[in-house]
């Protein structure tokens, strides 16, 4: 059966009959239940962690998917360990560096305010509402206005996820600091990937990973597929899981290399 290794939160994307591949999902260091470790947070290090996982599982090669920050790691992994990659799926991400489109300054400030206020137990209801709208996109909000509601007097992400232990909630609150990692980007290396690649973006992702980055990615990777989802924001994997499952299945079945089957 074909095997897909991913780093992303939307595991429900692969539940049900729309996706017919075996999927391995894991938490990178410092995320959810994975320990922080002693090594610095860099994309090359996280890529090496992924390679180590494959080695530990005795999986020589797999299809790789990365969503958002995971897309950075997936690119770094494919560049540094091409022998372990069959195909590449990049969702709501960027190749970074000088060619990448950065987050708007006002959005970076908003993210920083959420982290700082939540750590000091200051209500962040309005800030989270703004983040939520940015994540979902204006088109989705118009179709589903109820999804923009945030409980009043929310002071941390843990309140939105009551079952989340405080230490894990704090890790997630500080996740934005990861993006300050000294990463020069992968735009100048994309042409060397030489792997069948699918790039997916929501057309309303204007803040987290501006959707123009997907066009840049697709233009730099030879033969890349580009899919733009209307009325979808950065949360495209949560908004259109069935549609994305079908798109990925089509890509994986159409571009299937001879050595992609793992028995």
Per-region residue spans from a language model:
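Conserved alpha/beta-hydrolase catalytic His-Asp/Glu region
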Residues: 124-173, 177-184, 188-189
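Catalytic active-site module of serine/aspartate enzymes centered on a nucleophile-bearing elbow/loop
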Residues: 221-263
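Flexible "cap/lid" loop of the alpha/beta hydrolase fold
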Residues: 79, 86-123
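Conserved HGGG/HGGXW glycine-rich cap/lid loop of the alpha/beta-hydrolase fold
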Residues: 1-39
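Short beta-strand/loop motif that positions the catalytic acidic residue
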Residues: 193, 199-202
